[in-house]
Regions:
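Short catalytic/ligand-gating loop segments at beta-alpha or beta-beta junctions
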Residues: 181-186
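Short secondary-structure junction/hinge motifs that connect adjacent elements
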Residues: 7-13, 251-254
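Alpha/beta enzyme core
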Residues: 1-11, 18-34, 42-178, 189-194, ...
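C-terminal alpha-helical cap/extension of soluble enzyme domains
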Residues: 197, 208-254
Length: 254
């Protein structure tokens, strides 16, 4: 299946841009039959997007969703024009997700759903290739407070349902257009339990139910971001291995 390798601004600074690009170029050589995209997540400004475009990324996201609507259009259009001139595709965002992811920090009070009546104008004026919308997902492993959730018979938190009415209205206004959901990790409870069992402390970590993600994927959603799930799986597995094999110190063994 095609593969999108997504890099945030923070990950790019941590791992080094050149190393990342060359690793992906090596993956393309080693796996010639798999289409691979190197994508910038939540590019905060034109300069960051331009640096990634010039440096070998094949896809970028410009996130000006915190700006007023007209300014979001202006910034996004500038990135789109430069990216398209260089054969790079652009994801944009309307609406603001709550939660924390690297430099992206949005409180519940600052978050807001996407307004469907804005999407057609935004896409037409910017020329973006895909659009991230806000329908109730949230960044991080702590997507919802206990007050926002109910509890099932096991006492586990059950998050509020996504706003599929908003998604449906967006799809009506943008038929066939690629839609993106950020903050959509399901936060598998087996990994949360694994982290907690082996020395971690992640009470009430809860994600988006997978059946809701499958429903979104059957609609126009073509990209679902699940970074927290990858972190949980890796962290839980490493914690478990180190607890069960305290004599081991070679990272190649875990």
């Amino acid at each position: 299946a095609p593969l999108i390798l997504q890099v945030s601004k923070g990950a790019r600074a941590y791992a080094n841009h050149t190393y990342l690009v060359k690793l992906v170029e090596a993956a393309v050589i080693e796996c010639p039959n798999i289409p691979i995209a190197l994508h910038l997540d939540h590019g905060p400004d034109f300069e960051t997007c331009k640096s990634c475009i010039d440096g070998g990324f094949t896809s970028v996201m410009i996130d000006a969703s915190s700006k007023p609507f007209a300014e979001n259009i202006e910034i996004t259009k500038k990135v789109v024009e430069y990216a398209h001139d260089h054969g790079v595709v652009v994801e944009a965002e309307l609406g603001a997700l709550a939660g924390i992811e690297d430099d992206v920090k949005v409180s519940a009070e600052e978050s807001h759903y996407t307004h469907p009546e804005e999407v057609q104008e935004f896409v037409e004026k910017t020329g973006c290739d895909s659009l991230a919308i806000a329908i109730g997902t949230s960044h991080g492993a702590y997507k919802f407070t206990a007050a926002q959730c109910t509890r099932n018979e096991k006492g586990e938190l059950v998050p509020p349902p996504l706003r599929f009415d908003i998604l449906d209205e967006v799809v009506k206004r943008l038929p066939g257009f690629p839609i993106v959901l950020h903050g959509s990790s399901s936060v598998p409870q087996e990994f949360v339990r694994m982290v907690n069992e082996f020395g971690g402390k992640m009470p009430d970590a809860v994600g988006i139910p997978e059946e809701q993600l499958r429903k979104a994927a059957r609609s126009a959603v073509c990209k679902i971001n699940i970074d927290s799930d990858l972190r949980l799986a890796m962290t839980g597995t490493i914690r478990k291995f180190m607890a069960e094999h305290p004599d081991k110190f070679d990272p190649r063994e875990y």
